[in-house]
Curated annotation (Swiss-Prot):
UniProt keywords, alphabetically: Cytoplasm, Protein transport, Repeat, Transport
Annotated source species: Oryza sativa subsp. japonica
One family name in Pfam for this protein: Arm
Compositionally biased residues, Low complexity: 1-15
Family: Belongs to the importin alpha family.
SMART domains referenced in this protein's UniProt entry, alphabetically: ARM (SM00185)
Coarse class of the protein's main subcellular location: cytoplasm
ARM repeat feature ranges: 125-165, 167-206, 209-248, 253-292, 294-335, 338-383, 386-425, 438-477
Subunit structure, as described in the record: Forms a complex with importin subunit beta-1. The whole complex, most stable and composed of importin alpha, importin beta and NLS substrate, is referred to as PTAC or pore targeting complex.
Signal peptide from the UniProt entry: none
Protein name in UniProt: Importin subunit alpha-2
Function field: Binds specifically and directly to substrates containing either a simple or bipartite NLS motif. Promotes docking of import substrates to the nuclear envelope.
Induction: By dark in green leaf. Down-regulated by light.
Region annotation (Disordered) ranges: 1-36
Length: 528
């Protein structure tokens, strides 16, 4: 993911003058930047991993007549040329059915649409390009005309859905169909037709920012919001999925527009309150993008029941596809608005206990994304009050974080390091060095975390190395009986710091040299 934001370089005059802010900054002060970068990266992540940005519709929508029919055996081993010929013929049949009149014409239209749809739905040979070159899209637009039967509209929208699931240029071919697809999202359309049109729109929105802008300009947001209220689970899920594709950014305009639509927050809450985990998953992605891109959205969401509902899911669910957006949405909210930590995650209330339990579950997961995102969320909570620090420190999170900072991948080490660092300091509220919570520092160092921080000092990433240096300063300044420098030396910390002696980054050079001079100068070791 391209969602890692950098912490400010430490001050050369006072290495930890703003230590709380320095530790906190990578996840709070520059949280908006990281959240926006996430919104860009998530689309690619969903396409390649658990939740695809574009989806082929192979099975009939529940409730349609086709769901009750035998699909018939497709001959899957036909040669590509034969299937392409069938596709071109199916498009010709579409054209022919539009030109005839009289008895049986409607049946012929449906049969022609269904033949094309079945060919576009089969997974063995991609036939979208063949259909487009044969002229399918403008014909399908005609089949979407108002006054057509629901069955015809459904089949036409289904064909367009699978064309939109193709390659980028294939998806762009749907531009002439977008106004009618959006129009059929309206209240006068049947639920089946509206759902299929939402699916097609979701595929188009999943392709890129240019097509999303077109959909927004043509008014797709409001009818999709209405569909999220549908009592039919698959319709609400499809609408939420299409919505998340539509607002994913990087332009925040769509997210800011969405949060102003009457009822959208109520729709999100109502969806999260249902037992439907698939619906909750899609709606959680909507929350992810709103919390990544819209400051107004963040303010409204944190003051609603959404955080409590997300925490409930985090605490109770073992569904990875649900946990990822739930955790990321919570992480965004915690990073973006102090209200989340100060007024929602109040120590002594059940909600913080549930949140901490859910975060620890994710920390211990084998899934890399869950470990990283839970560390990020915890680092922000740990940057809160002394009570929050004590609660996290006393929990199972601390030994797990120590393990992560010493043995995991680089990005997870860094997030875990921010959390552990924040557990060790209390801000003074002025320009002085932060007060060290000695009990926490000693336990974390004695628990084996120091080698992990020295490893960070050796990082090629300057900001990560700065984080490691900041923690070494805490150890050397705050470990009892002036044993901190010796502990750092025993783990080859001096050598790690000396690599910055002639470093091109002046702030890092001054910080590292200042620490070496202060703690390992001429008087070092004389007390022994």
């Amino acid at each position: 993911m391209a969602d890692d934001s950098a912490s400010p370089s430490p001050s050369s005059a006072s290495p930890l003058q703003h230590h709380r802010e320095a530790l906190k900054s990578s996840v709070r002060n520059t949280a908006a930047s990281r959240r926006r970068e996430q919104a860009i990266a998530i689309g690619k992540e969903r396409r390649e991993a658990l939740i695809r940005a574009k989806r082929v519709c192979r099975a009939p929508i529940s409730g349609s007549d086709e769901a009750e029919m035998e699909e018939g055996d497709m001959v899957v081993d036909e040669e590509k040329a034969c299937l392409e010929a069938k596709t071109a013929h199916a498009v010709e049949e579409l054209k022919s059915a539009l030109s005839i009149q009289g008895k049986g014409v409607q049946k012929k239209k449906i049969e022609a649409l269904r033949d094309l749809r079945r060919l576009l739905s089969q997974p063995e040979v991609p036939l979208v390009d063949t259909a487009i070159k044969a002229g399918a899209v403008p014909l399908l637009v005609q089949y979407l005309s108002f006054g057509s039967s629901d069955e015809q509209l459904l089949e036409a929208a289904w064909c367009l859905t699978n064309i939109a699931a193709g390659e980028p240029e294939e998806t762009k071919s749907l531009l002439p169909a977008l106004p009618l697809l959006i129009a059929h999202l309206g209240e006068k359309s049947s639920t089946l037709v509206a759902e299929q049109c939402a699916w097609a729109i979701g595929n188009v929105a999943g392709e890129g920012a240019e097509l999303r802008s077109t959909l927004l300009a043509q008014g797709a947001l409001r009818p999709l919001t209405r569909l999220m209220f549908s009592s039919k689970g698959s319709t609400a899920r499809t609408a939420a999925w299409a919505m998340s594709n539509l607002i994913k950014g990087p332009d925040p305009k769509a997210a800011n527009e969405l949060i102003t639509i009457d009822g959208v927050l109520n729709a999100i809450i109502a969806s999260l309150e249902k037992e439907d985990e698939e619906l909750a998953t899609e709606v959680a992605w909507v929350v992810v993008y709103l919390s990544a891109l819209s400051d107004r959205g963040i303010s409204l969401i944190v003051r609603s029941s959404v955080p409590q509902l997300l925490i409930g899911r985090l605490f109770s669910s073992e569904n990875l596809q649900l946990l990822i957006p739930v955790l990321r949405g919570l992480g965004n909210l915690i990073a973006a608005d102090d209200y989340m930590v100060d007024s929602v995650l109040t120590v002594g209330h059940n909600i913080i206990d549930q949140a901490l339990s859910g975060l620890i579950k994710c920390l211990k997961s084998d899934n890399r994304v869950l470990r990283k995102e839970s560390s990020w969320a915890l680092s922000n909570i740990a940057a809160g009050s002394f009570e929050h620090k004590k609660l996290i420190f006393a929990s199972e999170a601390t030994p797990v974080l120590i393990r992560l900072v010493t043995s995991m991948q680089f990005d997870i080490r860094r997030e875990a390091a921010y959390t552990l660092g924040n557990l060790c300091v209390v801000p003074t509220g002025n320009c002085e060095l932060p007060k060290i919570i000695v009990e926490h520092l000693v336990a974390i160092v004695d628990g084996g975390a120091l080698p992990g921080f020295i490893h960070l000092v050796r990082s090629a990433d300057v900001d990560t190395a700065g984080l490691g240096l900041q923690f070494l300063e805490l150890v050397m300044r705050g470990y009892p009986n002036k044993q901190g420098p010796k502990l750092v030396e025993m783990e080859d910390g001096i050598e790690a710091m000396e690599r910055f002696q002639f470093h091109e980054n002046e702030q890092m050079r001054n910080m590292a040299n200042g620490l070496v001079d202060e703690y390992f100068g001429e008087d070092y070791g004389l007390d022994e």
